[in-house]
Amino acid sequence: MKKYITISREYGSGGHTIGSIVAKELGIPFYDNEIIDLAAKDSGLHPDFIKKNEQNISSGWFYTLLLGASYATPGTGSMHLGMNSATSAAPLADQVFNAQRNAIIQLAKKGPCVIVGRCSDYVLRHCEEIDRKDILNIFIYAPLADKVQYAIKTKGLDPATAERDVKLIDKRRANHYNTFTERTWGNRAHYDMLINSSLLGMEKTAKMIAQIAKES
């Protein structure tokens, strides 16, 4: 049985829901937003800052300067990011990525689990404490029309805005992944399976993944 299942996903493909069901089927923990909380606790970065910027910025000093203005303390011009001195030396994007990477490794070392997003497939592959043979990397995608409908239903958006948001979020996810892993997001060479969640629906897709994890 595969002990660690990573779920990379396009926005609107149902990856979070699928990952949650997989975890229940296997009787193991499911981690998504928990990664943000742990990363914030260990790094000193504010949880809201991590959540807002985890896929919005790329590595480099320019983005540190750019974001610094947005998070300056009013009337002082000084940065206030809720971070400790140990993290403040690195570019903000690197701080966010490193904090989440460390959180993913900490959670995985506790035992078998399902992890959604945040380059977890790449992080676990390069973690010496985790055997690569125990990892199942899944990429969930869906047709654009289905993802747009998902955004309309869950976010209450009009069709045009929903399509724009779907494309923008997927672009951000791709840029983030490509920047920090030097891989190509969604490239089949980096995953064990690429699954169109629209074919079977979320629940059946999740049960299929769980069965594969049990038998592989």
Residue ranges with predicted function:
Residues 1-9, 111:
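Pre-Walker A (Motif I) flank of P-loop NTPase domains
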Residues 6-22:
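Glycine-rich phosphate-binding P-loop
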Residues 29-40:
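Short beta-strand-centered segment that lines the nucleotide-binding/catalytic pocket of NTP-utilizing
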Residues 40-112:
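ATP-dependent small-molecule kinase phosphotransfer cores
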Residues 57-66, 74-78, 158-202:
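Small-molecule kinase domains that catalyze NTP-dependent phosphoryl transfer to phosphate-bearing small molecules
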Residues 90, 135-137, 145-147, 179, ...:
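Strand-loop microenvironment adjacent to phosphate/nucleotide-handling motifs in alpha/beta enzyme folds
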Residues 99-155:
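ATP-dependent NMP and nucleoside kinases share a basic, alpha-helical "lid"
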Residues 101, 202-210:
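Short, amphipathic alpha-helical "lid/cap" segments that border enzyme active or binding sites
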